[in-house]
Amino acid sequence: MSICFIDGAFRPTEECRLPVTDMAIQRGVGVFDSIRLYDRKAFALSEHLERLKESAKGAGIRVDGIVERMFDTIREGARRDDCPNEGNCLVKPYITGGDVNDCGRFPEPRHFVIFEEGPPICAEEYKTGVALQPTSVERLHPLVKSTNYLFGLMQSAGMSDVLECLYCPGGEVTETLRSSFFACLGGKIVTAPIGRVLGGITRNIVLKLARENGFTVEERCPLLTELLSANEAFITK
């Protein structure tokens, strides 16, 4: 069971529609974010919606007032009786390119917000770890959280034992398809700098807590060859 706020109202997600003329369908133009609700409270809501706004700007989508209205939409949705799993769920706000393509600018976007249960947490993955598939390609537009995941999904297509791809352009490890990547090397936590990767909200919190607790953090791209000597590696999203 999931609900969606679209065209000014909440309704079951399966009843919601986008016109086939929308640039999200025609050209893959759209941005989104993923926000966890815990007991009807959104985790880092302001930070996620600010990133959504910056993603939209980076994609050339006009966002006048849309993101600000999403604050109220998400808070209202979290209070609803039909909010999935009693308010412990995943919220995904989307902004699409709409129907108008003005020389690569999109002045009339559409927006909607989905509330869904989200994937279950797999305890076994936290015990044994996950497999990532290195790929030499670079993520397209790393500062834009685009709805278009096709390029990244192709890198690990058909690999049922792999969680997702690990971008390693030129042998430098940047991030995975959906997560920030960290390696513990020589007593330091090493992770790619903002500019090379999407500004992960959880990433920023992890780095802040690490520094506050005496860990040395180095913001650079670890080399793929260095991972063989890493004490450990982990991802966040």
Feature map (PLM): residue ranges:
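Helix-start/capping segments and mature chain N-termini
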Residues: M1-D64, E68-E76, T96, D102-K237
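Cytochrome P450 catalytic-domain "roof"
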Residues: R79
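Ordered, amphipathic secondary-structure segments that act as subunit-interaction surfaces
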Residues: C83-G97
